[in-house]
Amino acid sequence: MGKFFLRFFVIIFILAISIIFFLSYIGLETNKFNDLIKSKANEAHQHVKLEFKKTKIHLNPKELNLVVKLQKPKVLIKNNEIILSKLDLFLPLRSFITSDFLLKRAQIAFFENNIKDLSKITGLFLPKIINKQLNKIFKEGNLEGEFVIPFEPDGSIGKDYGFSGKVIDASIDLPKGFLIKNLTTEINLGKEIENGGLVATIRKGSLFDLQLADSIINLKLKKDETIIKSLLHTNGKISFSQIKEISSLLGLKTNSFKDINGKVDLKTKINFILGKKFKIKNLSYAMTGDIAHFVIDTEEKKIIKKYLPEYNSKVVLKNTNIKLFNSESDLITELNGLIKVKDHFDSFKVKKK
């Protein structure tokens, strides 16, 4: 009798392990939740429809819950199709028995989607004219990433949502002729990010002839404004036309210069608040870095030339460290390096307000 019970429990144990293994790694195909999932999704927004071929139920032994995996999921937003690579719904174990659709969280992933899919999503809440402009900004590139969306017991979306993803090999056509090329950026959003905001870290990309790798942009979205903190790493060649375009954004004047060109490696902090109607306020900036070679050709002052015949309107710098920052209404510049005097370079140090 003892051997019989031992064999019985061994068989039950092996059977239980086999079922757990099957449900964890292979899954059980079912249509138990199909209609309910579609109706719940379509109730969320009148212009959003969820479509999928079938569902598979998996056991999640780590959290002791069920995972409903939708097969070949896609979202239709105002008849615009967005293909998803994954849409997993996490439910309590009792949901399979009671048919109560008590959603705990959802994981939504997409892989190698066209960057223009962004404007399909933003079209739900942005005015049509603004969304058209946004669609023009995103010229080309791919998207990949994953949303994790928690749900409260009453079915509402929880606060601890998050997103992690990438923009890959994109071209971003910004206003005033600013074209960012070959942009690859990591994007993270959620409670684990500083102040619960969004952080974009540029891994590669270029603006004009400047490389932007290792630049970081932090956004904190509030009710009526967006707080933007950025650290822009620019490395490469610069020209006078580029200087004028960038200076216009910072409110700097270039009237006294005839030409500027050089090669730099700079880190620039730019912080500001973007208010209603995209109005910029509380702008502050600071720059540090190294200048390998820099030529500044200023407008020649005849009065100075008259009394200082050796005066040269062209300034040539090399191997120079620069620090520039604004303090209230003052702009402070510090330079320390080599400056060309006649046919040779001399060391110099300047601090100017």
Positions of predicted regions on the chain:
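Extended amphipathic, helix-rich lipid-handling scaffolds
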Residues: A41, L87, A106-I172, E192, ...
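Solvent-exposed loop/turn segments connecting transmembrane beta-strands
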Residues: T30, P61-E63, N79, L174-I180, ...
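Hydrophobic residues on conserved beta-strands that form the core of alpha/beta folds
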Residues: L50-K54, V68-L70, L84, L103, ...
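Terminal hydrophobic membrane-targeting helix
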Residues: I19-I115, N135-N142, E146-E152
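Short, cysteine-centered beta-strand-loop-beta hairpins and adjacent loop/turn segments enriched
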Residues: P73-E81, L174-G177, I296, H344
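N-terminal Sec-pathway targeting helices
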Residues: M1-A16
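Short glycine/proline-enriched turns and hinge-like loops at secondary-structure junctions
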Residues: N80-I82, S99-L102, I157-D160, G177-K181, ...
